[in-house]
Each structure stands twice: as structure tokens, then as C-alpha cells.
UniProtKB/Swiss-Prot annotation:
HAMAP family: Ribosomal_uS12_B (MF_00403_B). This is Small ribosomal subunit protein uS12. GO terms for cellular component: small ribosomal subunit. Keywords: Methylation, Ribonucleoprotein, Ribosomal protein, RNA-binding, rRNA-binding, tRNA-binding. GO terms for biological process: translation. The keyword DNA damage does not apply. InterPro entries: NA-bd_OB-fold, Ribosomal_uS12, Ribosomal_uS12_bac. It comes from Koribacter versatilis (strain Ellin345). It holds the Pfam family Ribosom_S12_S23. SUPFAM superfamilies: Nucleic acid-binding proteins (SSF50249).
């Protein structure tokens, strides 16, 4: 326990908040160019080939982003919009590609949860 005099001299320091998505720099989304599109295998109990892309953002930072949904049209030099949100079983993947914007098309034949995958409403 500090003395009163120590508190007068130093004061209490508020705990620093560490952001989960630093490359966004407090923006909701950022635009970037795909430098590499590839698949990655998840951590131990899971098994799959997760689709990921290496993206160079407009602020110059290069990040690994997850491409959600079934099938995608992304390749090198595609312009994408990214948002925060990590993928728990892929180490180092802290961002998601926003489907249905810029060069990324929405998921085809998607009936439920369409807004998350940029899918248009199907004809009745």
C-alpha cells in the first residue's frame, strides 16, 4: 500500500486497454489488396483447409485475413474490405474479409444469415 506522499508524487496509473485488431487503427473497416490467397490448417483438435488471404492495407500494414463462407473469387491483386474478428483455430488470423463488397462476391445459394455473407435475397 503506497503512502499518501507516494501517491502525490506518482499517482495511480489507469490500466492500458490493448485492442484486438490494431491494424484497423480504430476504424470499423479498412480496404486492402490481396498479396497472397491460400489455405491454412487449423489448430490441434480441428481439421480443415481454411481459406485465408494475406492483405496489404491502405495504411501499409500487411495482415492475414479469413475468407468466410463456401467458395470465393479472390486472387492476388483483388481489392477487399476487411473487418475485425479473429478465427479461434487459426493462430495469427485476427481479421475477416467482408463478403459482397468491392472485388469479393457474396456467397451463392445462401438462404439464412445472408447479410453476413453478402448474399442477395433469393427470388420467391
Amino acid at each position: 500500500m503506497p503512502t499518501f506522499n507516494q501517491l502525490v508524487r506518482k499517482g495511480r496509473t489507469a490500466p492500458k486497454f490493448k485492442t484486438a485488431s490494431p491494424a484497423l487503427q480504430s476504424c470499423p473497416q479498412k480496404r486492402g489488396v490481396c498479396t497472397r490467397v491460400y489455405t491454412q490448417t487449423p489448430k490441434k483438435p480441428n481439421s480443415a483447409l481454411r481459406k485465408v488471404a494475406r492483405v496489404r492495407l491502405t495504411n501499409g500494414i500487411e495482415v492475414t485475413t479469413y475468407i468466410p463462407g463456401i467458395g470465393h473469387n479472390l486472387q492476388e491483386h483483388s481489392i477487399v474490405l476487411i473487418r475485425g474478428g479473429r478465427v479461434k483455430d487459426l493462430p495469427g488470423v485476427r481479421y475477416h474479409v467482408v463478403r459482397g463488397t468491392l472485388d469479393s462476391v457474396g456467397v451463392a445459394n445462401r438462404k439464412q444469415g445472408r447479410s453476413k455473407y453478402g448474399a442477395k435475397r433469393p427470388k420467391a
